[in-house]
Regions:
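Short solvent-exposed beta->alpha transition segments
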Residues: 25, 31-32, 50-99
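N-terminal signal peptide c-region/cleavage motif recognized by signal peptidases
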Residues: 14-16
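Short, linear, compositionally biased motifs with a strong N-terminal bias
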Residues: 10-11
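Positively charged n-region of N-terminal signal peptides that target proteins for export
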Residues: 1-4
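Exposed beta-sheet edge and beta->alpha loop/turn motif
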Residues: 91-143
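Short, low-complexity N-terminal intrinsically disordered segments enriched in polar/charged residues
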Residues: 18-43
Length: 143
């Protein structure tokens, strides 16, 4: 019995360590989320961008926080090199049937741009953030 209770406690604690506890209801909601986060990046409101994603992102909170901290550091460093942000641009939307979507945005700066990629996955409850990444290699978007 003690082993069962301990196992149940560990399961509950480990589940609560994950940030994701909500679902996006449809594709327009995923599109709105991507646009909102891209705009928050443009405004250099990185914490708010990660706060917007985390309820839908099934990663442990400490991993999201670590990614957020690194992103704040590097975006600030990049901004010194590539100037002030001047806008966002949606580059493309890719799909795998009706179960996965990847949206790509550029945050434009005076001298260059950074690329944001959002991947959403549809499960039985709705859409979740399956992945989010950003980099400064937007040139890979040329076809």
């Amino acid at each position: 019995m003690k082993r069962f209770i301990l196992s149940l406690f560990v399961l509950v604690v480990s589940m609560s360590a994950f940030a994701q506890d909500d679902y996006l209801k449809d594709i327009p909601a995923t599109e709105a989320m991507s646009k909102k986060v891209a705009e928050l990046f443009r405004q250099n409101k990185i914490k708010l961008a990660f706060d917007a994603l985390s309820p839908y992102w099934p990663l442990p909170e400490n991993e999201i926080e670590s990614s957020e901290e690194k992103t704040i550091k590097y975006v600030n460093m990049l901004s010194d090199r590539i100037g002030s942000p001047i806008g966002i641009l949606k580059v493309k939307t890719e799909t795998i049937g009706d179960i996965a979507i990847r949206e790509t945005y550029l945050v434009r700066y005076e001298v260059s741009a950074i690329r944001l990629k959002f991947t959403y996955y549809k499960n039985e409850d709705g859409w979740i953030v399956n992945g989010f990444m950003w980099d400064d290699t937007f040139s890979e978007e040329f076809e």
